A protein has these predicted regions:
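Alpha-helical transmembrane segments and their juxtamembrane interfaces
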Residues: 8-9, 20, 92
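Short, positively charged and aromatic/hydrophobic N-terminal segments
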Residues: 20, 24-27
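Structured-RNA-binding interfaces characteristic of tRNA pseudouridine synthases
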Residues: 28-257
Length: 257
């Protein structure tokens, strides 16, 4: 299934930085932290996180920053998306040399000219040095689009999960709402192989703060908001909900699945 991904972060006031004074040594370049929001079409990429070969969103962004600064630049994302998954509001931060300080609203244009059309910077703001895109995040939102059309519209290819079988949207909504709250989501997690060993007690407990099901024509949108998610957790929950709507599985508390 394909989805969209967004991150909510704590609001931060603009940071303060001084430009280097004339004659100052360039041995250590003062840096300014910037919070960026990006949107991207995930189809051409192997996910967010950097990998050998450079075909990820992070790799493409870092090349754009490095080209602009003339020096290698590492960015830090608020979360990771899998291959083919899109984002409407992926937050990340970068540290820019003070020599490149420009008004915050000029950063999107400066970077977008160096990026492919499938990636766009939509917002930038200066933040204090203690801000971290991952650790300052207060919530994450994932949205999945399901097409119920008998024949998938070509323009939905790669953007919607095709499920033309008959199922009740009302029961789908009931199933999705069962995931609200704090539960043990072991049944909705795929192990990467890099989990801490032994796995700590409570590792699979997660809190979902909001769920929503909306229908527009032949499209159904499922939205989950939470403080954090396990690997492939949202994809597995989205896959289970229509099965409950079809009656192939019963509605149960997710902690007992």
């Amino acid at each position: 299934a394909d989805g969209t991904h967004g991150i909510h972060s704590k609001p931060s006031p603009s940071g303060t930085c001084r430009l280097p004074k004339p004659g100052r040594s360039n041995t250590i370049t003062p840096m300014t932290r910037i919070r960026f929001t990006a949107a991207y079409d995930g189809r051409p990429y192997l996910g967010w996180q950097s990998q050998p070969g450079g075909r990820t969103v992070q790799d493409v962004l870092e090349r754009a920053f490095s080209g602009l600064f003339g020096t290698p630049c590492r960015i830090h994302g608020s979360g990771r998306t899998d291959a083919g998954v899109h984002a409407l509001g992926q937050v990340f931060h970068a540290d820019a040399p003070d020599t490149h300080r420009i008004p915050a609203d000029k950063w999107p244009a400066a970077l977008n000219t160096r990026l492919p059309r499938t990636i766009r910077i939509t917002h930038a703001e200066y933040v204090p040095p203690g801000f971290h895109a991952r650790f300052s995040a207060t919530g994450k939102t994932y949205r999945y689009c399901i097409s119920r059309a008998p024949i998938l519209n070509p323009f939905d290819a790669g953007l919607a999960w095709h499920r033309p079988l008959a199922w009740s949207v009302d029961i789908l909504e009931q199933a999705v709402h069962l995931f609200r709250g704090t539960h043990n989501f072991t049944a909705f997690a795929a192990l990467r192989g890099n989990e801490p060993r032994p796995i700590p007690e409570g590792y699979f407990r997660r809190t979902i703060t909001q769920t929503q099901v909306a229908q527009t024509g032949e499209h159904v949108f499922i939205t989950f908001t939470g403080t954090g998610f396990l690997y492939k957790m949202v994809r597995l929950m989205t896959g289970a909900a229509p099965e409950a709507a079809r009656g192939t599985i019963t509605l149960e508390d997710p902690a007992r699945l």
